[in-house]
Structure formats: structure tokens, C-alpha cells
Amino acid sequence: MAKARITKALKSMTQPPSPARLAIGGMLAMASAFGIGRFVYTPILPVMIADGALTPASAGIVAAANFLGYLLGALAGASAATQRHPRLFFLGGLLAGGLSLAGMAAPPSIPVFSIMRFVGGFGSAFVIVCLSSMALEPLVRAGRIGLSAAPFAGVGFGIAFSSGLVSVLASAGVGWKAMWVANALVSTAMALLLFFLLPAPSLPAHAPAPAGRKGLPRISPALAALVVSYGLFGFGYVITATFLVAIVRETASLATLEPYAWAIVGLAGALSIPFWSWVARRTTDVFAYAAGCLVEATGVALSVVSPTPATIIISGIFLGGTFMAITAIGLGIARRLTQMAPQRAQAIMTSAFGLGQIVGPALAGHMRETSGSFVAPSLIAAAALVVAGALGAFVARSR
């Protein structure tokens, strides 16, 4: 009986997954790699700063290391090997992320922290690049294009869960090392579950060869503008996404919001995907992308221009309610503009995004050390998001 159940389970792993299974698997992957793997740094960071493990400047360097890993991982993700074996690199990236989280529990060391975050960023890039083959493209081929944005909601759920976990541990007097280990266990458990949930994708018979110049997307003016816009978006969102909880902790009147500020971002992010998908259907995907950038610019500016409990809540809703939707919609536009090489286009977009993310936290951490506040870097980020939205309008005219 037991043998029959095992045989049935193994057989199910080789069957084409249902659209619901693809969407749920994609959500778990994004929750593990990004909601926890990337963004748990935000609620743990103030605890590390208070304990003397990091300063605002060194925190920016460590954050930038994660995004450097993401950038280099995205470049590596454009290789023929990842296109031939997407599941191997997908699962490997998830496991690398979990191990890197555990490594953050090491004794305080900027080089060690930077290496761990680099490894996590490198792995997460493989996850999002290979997600196209593992879940997004199969959903499109199954005629369920409406579900192709669902995996990105996993980031919001992961943020909300990890933020809640950190708050519970903090209220129990647990230190930052245990916070990292607890989140590492959750992230790794999700990765192991995905081993059974998502089988290797089957490429359609008409799929182009993964290697060679035929697989390279043509860089049209519209795609070039989108890539630049996406890089500015990466720079614009990441400063607030990295330091929001630190901004809240530094303002005495906002102290009661610290356990909730990042959870608000996560919940808004989880709910943002259906809303912005609806906006895209009622208008166009490019309009939704540009409008999202402008809404996010408002949220980023509100976090520092008038930091009251009300504006911080609005800022969290605007940030969380846009950044994953913009990510998903931007990648969808790129896939549409380069239909013959979607995974390579996704790698190019991810690289531009990663470059913007490297500059953002390093600049913000340095400016915080010299000026004593996050006001100037946050306003620069808001301006970058306005330009990103304007470039989105150019994409609409050029395509």
C-alpha cells in the first residue's frame, strides 16, 4: 500500500502540473526567494544596528552586496545552461537562498554578511529568471495568462509572514541571529516543497533553440526605454524597501508602528497583483506600469517628507501596493516585446533592475551617515521613479 502511494506520488511529479499548481508553486518560490530571502533584511536590520552589528553605512554596503549578487546572477541566468536545465538552477537558487539566510547568524563581520547576502542575491536571480520557464510560460501556453502574475503575490505574503515572525521573536526577546535562523528554516522548507510541486517544464515543439544568436532579443527603442525605466525603478523602490523600518525606528513618534510597518507593505503587495492586473486590462499594461511608478514615487516621498503614523501607513500601502505589480507588469511587457526570446529578455530586465538596486542602498546608507537622515536619498529615489514612469509613456508611443 505504501509502495503504491509512493509510486503514485512520483508519477504525479512527472505529469504536467495544473495551472493552479503552477501558480501556487510560483507564489511559494517568490515568497521564499524574495519575500523572505531578500526582504527579511528590512525588519531585522534595525535590531542589528541597535546591537552594534551594523551601522547605516555598512548596512547599505551589505544590502548592495545582495543586489550585486542579483545582478551577476541575472547575467549568468541568460546562459544556455539555465535554459536547458531551468529546474536545476531554479531549485539550486532557492536552496542557496536558504543557506545564505542561515549564514547571516555568523558573528558580526561585514565581509561575511556581504558574502552571505551576495550568495542569496545570486540565487534569487536564478529563481526569477527560471520562473519564466518553470511557471509563467506554461501558464501562458495553458491559456491562463491571467494567472501569470499570481506568483508575484508570493513576495507580499512572504514579506508579511517574515515580518510577523520577526516581530514575534523580537517581543520574546530573541536576538537577530535566531531571527535569521528561523527565517532560513522557513525558506528552506518552501524550497523542499517546491521539489515535489513543480516538475521540469516541457518546452513546446516550436520553441527556438536556447543557444546561439537566434535566441537574442532585438533591442528596439521601446525595449531600450523599458530596460532603462526598469533600472530606475529598481533604484527608486529599493531605498525605502531597505530602510523603511529603520526610518520608523529613528522617529520617536512612529515607535508604535515598527512591528507593523513592514507587514503593511507585504499585505499591500499581496493584494496589489489583482488590482494592477485589472488596471492593465481596463487600460494597457504600459499605462499600468507608468501609473504604478508615479504612485510609488508618492509613497517613497511621503515616508520622509512628513513622517506621521498616517503618512507612514500610506507610504507602506503605496510602496507595497506597487513594487511587485510593477515588477510583474514590466517583465510581462518585456516578454511581449521579445516573444522569440522571453527568458533572455527577462535576464536583461533583471540585470537592469539589479544595477539600480546596487546603487540605491549604498548611496542611501552613505548619505544617512553624512546627513543624519534618509530624506535626501529618498527624494532622489522618488525623482527616479517619476522618470521611470515617463519612460513608460515613451514605451507606449514607441511600440
Locate each region found by the language model:
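A late C-terminal transmembrane helix in Major Facilitator Superfamily
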Residues: 337-373, 381
